[in-house]
């Protein structure tokens, strides 16, 4: 059979319930979909500020009969995803803030604060954490077993600075500057003193202006921002074609 066959449910939602792969070998081994709802309070092993009401879930069973689950809330956001191994859950838990930004991701078997418990020494080293500014731009990113990375944006929505854990120890910021046409032209490090949560450049447009006298920046001069002990890693020049 040289075609893919999809079977849909008999409802106005027209959701797929089975999909048979190409070839006779898959006639009796389709990928099947089962749509379910579940109250989050029934998850005794996962109960941290989960919104009230039912999750909309889909159980996807592959050709070998292995089921995987994904549950979404009423806003279409994935809250739980994973599979069961007997009675053991292997689920990833996604947490959002009031602005629909993803703020925490807890992999399977990671300890996290439960409802009515104070914040404490939970296993944040094995989870993912994100923070955002008032424009929903990520300013803080924490990956498992890594120090957090900070990001600073200017008024023009450019990510100008970033800083990982090792750079923080050395007092360094990595910078990336664009020209007046928003083309990236300069990258490097500097020793400016910033705190990402203060949004220090939110009202400043940072540019790199072409100027052959700007020897420290290889033909550019940063505008509207001082640079402390800068070291340039890359400098890009663009040609100007005339008609």
Where are these regions (language model features)?
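Beta-strand elements of repeat-based all-beta scaffolds
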Residues: 1-242
């Amino acid at each position: 059979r040289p075609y893919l066959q999809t079977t849909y449910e008999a409802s106005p939602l027209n959701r797929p319930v089975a999909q048979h792969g190409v070839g006779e070998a898959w006639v009796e081994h389709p990928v099947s979909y089962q749509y379910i709802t579940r109250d989050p309070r029934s998850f005794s092993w996962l109960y941290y500020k989960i919104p009230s009401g039912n999750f909309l879930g889909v159980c996807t069973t592959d050709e070998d009969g292995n089921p995987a689950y994904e549950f979404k809330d009423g806003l279409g956001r994935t809250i739980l995803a994973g599979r069961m191994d007997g009675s053991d859950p292997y689920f990833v838990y996604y947490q959002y803030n009031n602005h629909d930004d993803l703020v925490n991701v807890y992999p399977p078997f990671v300890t996290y604060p439960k409802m009515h418990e104070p914040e404490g020494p939970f296993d944040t080293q094995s989870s993912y954490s994100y923070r955002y500014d008032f424009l929903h731009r990520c300013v803080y990113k924490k990956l498992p077993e890594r120090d957090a990375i900070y990001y600073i944006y200017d008024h023009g929505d450019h990510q100008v600075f970033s800083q990982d854990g090792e750079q923080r120890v050395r007092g360094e910021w990595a910078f990336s500057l664009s020209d007046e046409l928003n083309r990236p032209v300069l990258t490097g490090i500097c020793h400016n003193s910033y705190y990402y949560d203060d949004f220090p450049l939110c009202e400043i447009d940072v540019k790199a202006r072409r100027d052959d006298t700007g020897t420290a920046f290889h033909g550019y001069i940063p505008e509207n921002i001082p640079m402390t002990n800068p070291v340039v890693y890359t400098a890009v020049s663009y040609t100007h074609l005339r008609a």
